[in-house]
């Protein structure tokens, strides 16, 4: 008995859909690295294709089948070194399996283990960041497929609020004056102590388009994010390390907007070799300690726009 292809039938409501697919799909992936051992990841995949108004549904099983085939076969046959290149392979395969699709997209997220040392005692510890890849393909009217790919990272750090710190500094000045200290003495005291403020756990994200013929190092992106907050966080901290982390953050207070702008400037400086039309996404989310809400800042732009803005500021 032959089964009808229900997905290929016409829907009751003839409206096209932008993205249909599967999310929260995990697969073990092994990627090659130049002159280093292979890296093993357990990424989460989200894969989508568009659906025309004339078709009831996509062939859903084909999407996880694509990932299975790419992971099991293509990775063995090809030397794939980056998650962004893996994403491109999956997008191209999605078009093969979903012949009715004119758009295909994949998002990939994976924990990324980094070897770090605590800042003072130099204790070894494993720190976890998150690497991200995205590929987006469009099939033109001639059947040619155009794919863009992006790679990025998400890193946790610490931020210290400049506003509360400034208010506490003003309170300290007033209190010291009432106790009879001179302005010179007050200045020396304030230079010798760390002024308190409230902190946030900051989550920085940078995504950068990878044009054909170019490479974008994930380790460089991770460093940009780390260096753009008030300070780094560590899994393992002894007492002297903890004091160092807290003091460092309080001596480098930053708003959520400051972190986002710092990442933008560092991206422009570090990736000065990338073309003008390269797409860049920068996002900072600060988990507030004295509020129930979070603070958020984001910029989605091209390198040309960012370079022009920064150039205007320096002139």
UniProtKB/Swiss-Prot annotation:
GO biological process, one term: tetrahydromethanopterin biosynthetic process
UniProt keyword Cell inner membrane, yes or no: no
InterPro entries: GTP_cyclohydrolase_FolE2/MptA, GTP_cyclohydrolase_MptA
Free-text cofactor note: Binds 1 Fe(2+) ion per subunit.
Entries under Pfam families matching the protein: GCHY-1
Site, as annotated: May be catalytically important: 161
Keyword vocabulary terms for this entry: Hydrolase, Iron, Metal-binding
Pathway: Cofactor biosynthesis; 5,6,7,8-tetrahydromethanopterin biosynthesis
Record's keyword annotation contains Transferase: no
GO MF term list: GTP cyclohydrolase I activity; GTP cyclohydrolase IV activity; iron ion binding
E.C. code: 3.5.4.39
EC class name: hydrolase
Cofactor(s) the protein needs: Fe(2+)
Subunit relationships: Homodimer.
Function comment: Converts GTP to 7,8-dihydro-D-neopterin 2',3'-cyclic phosphate, the first intermediate in the biosynthesis of coenzyme methanopterin.
Name the UniProt record assigns to this protein: GTP cyclohydrolase MptA
Source organism of the structure: Methanococcus maripaludis (strain C6 / ATCC BAA-1332)
């Amino acid at each position: 008995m032959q089964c009808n292809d229900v997905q290929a039938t016409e829907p009751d409501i003839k409206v096209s859909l932008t993205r249909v697919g599967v999310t929260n799909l995990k697969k073990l992936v092994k990627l090659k690295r130049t002159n280093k051992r292979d890296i093993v990841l357990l990424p989460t995949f989200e894969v989508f294709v568009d659906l025309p108004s004339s078709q009831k549904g996509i062939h859903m099983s084909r999407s996880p089948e694509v990932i299975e085939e790419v992971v099991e076969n293509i990775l063995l046959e090809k030397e794939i070194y980056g998650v962004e290149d893996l994403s491109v392979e999956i997008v191209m395969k999605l078009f093969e399996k979903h012949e009715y699709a004119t758009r295909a997209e994949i998002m990939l997220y994976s924990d990324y283990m980094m070897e770090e040392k605590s800042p003072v005692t130099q204790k070894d510890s494993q720190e976890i960041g998150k690497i991200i890849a995205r590929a987006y393909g469009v099939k033109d009217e001639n059947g040619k497929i155009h794919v863009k790919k992006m790679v990025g990272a998400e890193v946790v750090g610490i931020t210290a609020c400049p506003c509360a710190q400034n208010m506490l500094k003003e309170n300290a000045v007033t209190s010291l004056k009432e106790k009879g200290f001179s302005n010179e003495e007050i200045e020396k005291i304030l230079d010798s102590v760390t002024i308190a403020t409230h902190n946030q756990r900051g989550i920085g994200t940078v995504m950068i388009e990878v044009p054909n013929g170019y490479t974008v190092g994930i380790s460089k992106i991770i460093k940009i994010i780390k260096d753009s907050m008030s300070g780094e966080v560590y899994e393992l901290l002894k007492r002297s390390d903890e004091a160092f982390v807290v003091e460092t953050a309080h001596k480098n207070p930053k708003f959520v907007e400051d972190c986002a702008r710092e990442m933008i400037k560092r991206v422009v400086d570090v990736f000065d070799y990338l073309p003008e039309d390269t797409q860049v996404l920068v996002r900072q989310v600060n988990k507030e300690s004295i509020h129930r809400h979070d603070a958020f800042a984001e910029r989605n732009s091209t390198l040309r726009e960012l370079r022009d803005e920064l150039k205007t500021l320096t002139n």
